[in-house]
Protein backbone atom coordinates (compact mmCIF):
# COMPACT_ATOMS: atom_id res chain seq x y z
CA UNK A 1 0.00 0.00 0.00
CA UNK A 2 2.79 2.47 0.88
CA UNK A 3 4.44 1.91 -2.50
CA UNK A 4 1.19 2.92 -4.26
CA UNK A 5 0.90 6.08 -2.14
CA UNK A 6 4.50 7.01 -2.93
CA UNK A 7 3.88 6.24 -6.62
CA UNK A 8 0.85 8.57 -6.72
CA UNK A 9 2.82 11.36 -5.02
CA UNK A 10 5.75 11.01 -7.43
CA UNK A 11 3.48 10.91 -10.48
CA UNK A 12 1.77 14.11 -9.28
CA UNK A 13 5.11 15.91 -9.53
CA UNK A 14 5.94 14.44 -12.94
CA UNK A 15 8.18 11.51 -11.99
CA UNK A 16 7.61 8.30 -13.96
CA UNK A 17 7.25 5.21 -11.73
CA UNK A 18 7.08 1.43 -12.05
CA UNK A 19 6.14 -1.09 -9.36
CA UNK A 20 7.21 -4.68 -9.96
CA UNK A 21 5.73 -7.91 -8.61
CA UNK A 22 8.99 -9.84 -9.18
CA UNK A 23 11.76 -10.46 -6.64
CA UNK A 24 14.30 -9.41 -9.32
CA UNK A 25 13.45 -7.14 -12.24
CA UNK A 26 15.10 -4.56 -14.49
CA UNK A 27 14.50 -1.37 -16.44
CA UNK A 28 16.55 1.00 -18.60
CA UNK A 29 17.14 4.74 -18.58
CA UNK A 30 19.02 5.57 -21.76
CA UNK A 31 22.21 3.45 -21.78
CA UNK A 32 21.87 2.68 -18.05
CA UNK A 33 20.33 -0.69 -17.16
CA UNK A 34 19.13 -1.23 -13.60
CA UNK A 35 18.53 -4.70 -12.18
CA UNK A 36 16.93 -4.40 -8.79
CA UNK A 37 16.12 -6.84 -6.06
CA UNK A 38 15.00 -7.09 -2.49
CA UNK A 39 17.80 -8.17 -0.17
CA UNK A 40 16.64 -11.78 -0.40
CA UNK A 41 14.36 -13.96 -2.50
CA UNK A 42 12.37 -15.81 0.18
CA UNK A 43 11.56 -18.68 -2.20
CA UNK A 44 15.07 -19.61 -3.35
CA UNK A 45 17.56 -18.17 -0.85
CA UNK A 46 18.52 -19.04 2.69
CA UNK A 47 20.67 -15.93 3.22
CA UNK A 48 20.43 -12.32 2.06
CA UNK A 49 22.52 -10.91 -0.75
CA UNK A 50 25.68 -9.47 0.86
CA UNK A 51 26.32 -5.81 1.57
CA UNK A 52 29.23 -5.75 -0.90
CA UNK A 53 29.74 -7.85 -4.00
CA UNK A 54 31.42 -11.25 -3.70
CA UNK A 55 32.20 -13.93 -6.33
CA UNK A 56 29.03 -15.94 -5.66
CA UNK A 57 26.75 -12.90 -5.98
CA UNK A 58 28.64 -11.66 -9.05
CA UNK A 59 28.05 -15.04 -10.74
CA UNK A 60 24.38 -15.13 -9.64
CA UNK A 61 23.51 -11.76 -11.17
CA UNK A 62 25.70 -12.27 -14.26
CA UNK A 63 23.83 -15.50 -15.01
CA UNK A 64 20.45 -13.87 -14.25
CA UNK A 65 21.23 -11.03 -16.67
CA UNK A 66 22.38 -13.47 -19.37
CA UNK A 67 19.28 -15.67 -18.95
CA UNK A 68 16.99 -12.62 -19.09
CA UNK A 69 18.78 -10.95 -22.02
CA UNK A 70 19.78 -7.91 -19.93
CA UNK A 71 22.27 -5.68 -21.75
CA UNK A 72 23.44 -2.12 -21.50
CA UNK A 73 26.45 0.13 -21.72
CA UNK A 74 26.19 0.72 -17.97
CA UNK A 75 24.70 -1.98 -15.75
CA UNK A 76 23.80 -1.72 -12.07
CA UNK A 77 22.41 -4.19 -9.58
CA UNK A 78 20.56 -2.29 -6.86
CA UNK A 79 19.31 -4.17 -3.81
CA UNK A 80 18.07 -3.30 -0.36
CA UNK A 81 17.32 -4.87 2.97
CA UNK A 82 20.57 -4.49 4.92
CA UNK A 83 19.82 -0.92 6.10
CA UNK A 84 23.25 0.27 4.99
CA UNK A 85 24.68 1.83 1.83
CA UNK A 86 27.57 0.34 -0.17
CA UNK A 87 28.83 0.66 -3.75
CA UNK A 88 30.99 -2.11 -5.24
CA UNK A 89 32.31 -2.34 -8.80
CA UNK A 90 32.11 -5.84 -10.30
CA UNK A 91 33.33 -7.38 -13.55
CA UNK A 92 30.26 -6.55 -15.65
CA UNK A 93 28.08 -4.39 -13.39
CA UNK A 94 28.15 -2.09 -10.37
CA UNK A 95 26.54 -3.52 -7.22
CA UNK A 96 24.71 -1.06 -4.98
CA UNK A 97 23.21 -1.79 -1.56
CA UNK A 98 20.70 0.86 -0.55
CA UNK A 99 19.37 1.90 2.83
CA UNK A 100 15.87 1.35 4.14
CA UNK A 101 13.24 4.04 3.81
CA UNK A 102 11.42 2.33 6.67
CA UNK A 103 14.04 2.62 9.42
CA UNK A 104 13.81 0.25 12.39
CA UNK A 105 11.34 -2.33 13.62
CA UNK A 106 11.76 -4.74 16.53
CA UNK A 107 13.12 -7.40 14.13
CA UNK A 108 15.52 -4.95 12.46
CA UNK A 109 16.77 -3.68 15.83
CA UNK A 110 17.37 -7.25 17.06
CA UNK A 111 19.25 -8.25 13.89
CA UNK A 112 20.98 -5.05 12.70
CA UNK A 113 20.76 -2.57 15.58
CA UNK A 114 18.69 0.60 15.74
CA UNK A 115 19.01 1.82 12.16
CA UNK A 116 17.80 5.14 10.83
CA UNK A 117 15.93 5.59 7.56
CA UNK A 118 17.66 6.73 4.41
CA UNK A 119 16.92 7.19 0.73
CA UNK A 120 19.53 6.60 -1.95
CA UNK A 121 18.96 8.14 -5.37
CA UNK A 122 20.68 8.22 -8.73
CA UNK A 123 20.63 11.05 -11.26
CA UNK A 124 21.26 10.07 -14.87
CA UNK A 125 22.39 12.63 -17.46
CA UNK A 126 23.54 10.98 -20.69
CA UNK A 127 26.56 8.82 -19.87
CA UNK A 128 26.95 10.38 -16.42
CA UNK A 129 25.49 9.01 -13.20
CA UNK A 130 25.54 10.62 -9.77
CA UNK A 131 24.40 8.90 -6.61
CA UNK A 132 23.34 10.52 -3.37
CA UNK A 133 21.81 9.81 0.02
CA UNK A 134 19.17 11.57 2.07
CA UNK A 135 19.15 10.34 5.65
CA UNK A 136 17.90 11.04 9.12
Where are each of the predicted segments found?
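Short, surface-exposed beta-strand/loop micro-motifs that present aromatic residues
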Residues: 24-26
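Short strand-coil-strand connectors
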Residues: 28-31
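C-terminal lobe/lid and adjacent interdomain/linker elements of RecA-like ASCE P-loop ATPase modules
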Residues: 131-136
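Active-site neighborhood of divalent metal-dependent phosphoester bond hydrolases
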Residues: 1-18
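Conserved beta-sheet core of the metallophosphoesterase superfamily
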Residues: 12-15, 21, 33-35, 40-130
Amino acid sequence: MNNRILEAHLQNIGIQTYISNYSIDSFCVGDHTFTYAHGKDNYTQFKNFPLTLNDKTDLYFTQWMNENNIHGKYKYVVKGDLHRFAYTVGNTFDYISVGSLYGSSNWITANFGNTKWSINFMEIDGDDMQIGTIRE
